[in-house]
From Swiss-Prot:
Region (Disordered), start-end ranges: 107-149
Species of the source: Rattus norvegicus (Rat)
Assigned keywords, A-Z: Membrane, Phosphoprotein, Transmembrane, Transmembrane helix
Record-given protein name: Transmembrane protein C16orf54 homolog
Membrane topology: Single-pass membrane protein
Transmembrane parts of this sequence: 34-54
C-alpha cells in the first residue's frame, strides 16, 4: 500500500488559526450594540441642533430689526410732543390706535368745533325743531325769562315751592326785620308757626302725621303719639 504524503505541520497550523478566530467573532453577541449606537447618535444630533439654534438667536439679537424700530418723538409746530407712528399709512388707517398721540402740550387745546366730531354728529339724536313765528305776525316776541339757578338758599314763594304731603321742608335763615335789635334776643328770631319757641337754626318741619306715615311704611307702630 503506497504511503500517502503527509502535509507539513506548518501548513496545518496555518489552517487551524483562521478557523478559531472566526469562531471567536461569531460567539461575541453584537445584537444589543445597534440600538445603543442609534440612541447615542440621536442624542448627539439633538445637542448639535439645539446648540446651532441657540447660537443663531444669540448672534441675531444684537442686530436691530428694521421693521420693529423704536418710536421717535417729534416736536410739532404747535408746541406738542408727538409719537411718530412706526406703521405704514395703510396700517394706521385700518388701526384706530395707531395714530399719533400728543404727550406734552405747551398751550391749551383748541376749543371744540360747534358741530362736534363726525362720530358725535352721527350718533347724536335728532334735534327737536323749535317752532318759528309766522312771518305775518309783526309783534316782537320775547323769549320767556328763565330764573337763574342758584346754589345758595333764597326765600321761595308759594308758587315756586308747593307743599307736598310726606315731604320735609327746611326753613332758611331770614334777615332781621329791625336793625336795632340785638343779636340773640328773642325778637330777632322768627317764631315757628303755631309755637312760641324761636327758630334758632335750620330745622325740618315735620308733623306727627308725617312721622306716623313713615312708621307705617316701615311696618312698625309709633309709640307715644
Amino acid at each position: 500500500m503506497p504511503a500517502t504524503p503527509q502535509q507539513p505541520s506548518g501548513h496545518t497550523e496555518g489552517l487551524t488559526e483562521p478557523t478559531s478566530e472566526a469562531a471567536m467573532w461569531v460567539v461575541i453577541p453584537c445584537g444589543p450594540c445597534i440600538p445603543i449606537m442609534l440612541g447615542l447618535a440621536s442624542l448627539t444630533a439633538f445637542f448639535i441642533i439645539t446648540t446651532a439654534v441657540l447660537a443663531e438667536r444669540l448672534f441675531r439679537r444684537p442686530q436691530p430689526d428694521p421693521s420693529q424700530r423704536a418710536p421717535t418723538l417729534v416736536w410739532r409746530p404747535g408746541g406738542e410732543l408727538w409719537i411718530e407712528p412706526t406703521s405704514s399709512a395703510r396700517e394706521r388707517s385700518e388701526d384706530w390706535y395707531g395714530s399719533s398721540i400728543p404727550l406734552l402740550m405747551d398751550r391749551a387745546p383748541d376749543p371744540p368745533t360747534p358741530g362736534g366730531t363726525l362720530e358725535g354728529r352721527a350718533t347724536a339724536p335728532p334735534a327737536i325743531p323749535t317752532p318759528h313765528p309766522s312771518p305775518s305776525s309783526l309783534v316782537p316776541q320775547t323769549p320767556p325769562e328763565v330764573p337763574a339757578q342758584s346754589t345758595f338758599w333764597r326765600p321761595q314763594t308759594q308758587e315756586e315751592s308747593p307743599y307736598a304731603t310726606g315731604l320735609v321742608s327746611w326753613v332758611g335763615p331770614e334777615p332781621m326785620a329791625e336793625a336795632g335789635l340785638e343779636v340773640g334776643s328773642p325778637r330777632a328770631w322768627r317764631l315757628r308757626q303755631g309755637s312760641l319757641e324761636p327758630d334758632w337754626s335750620l330745622q325740618p318741619r315735620v308733623t306727627l302725621e308725617q312721622i306716623s306715615a313713615f312708621w307705617k311704611r316701615e311696618g312698625r307702630t309709633s309709640v307715644g303719639f
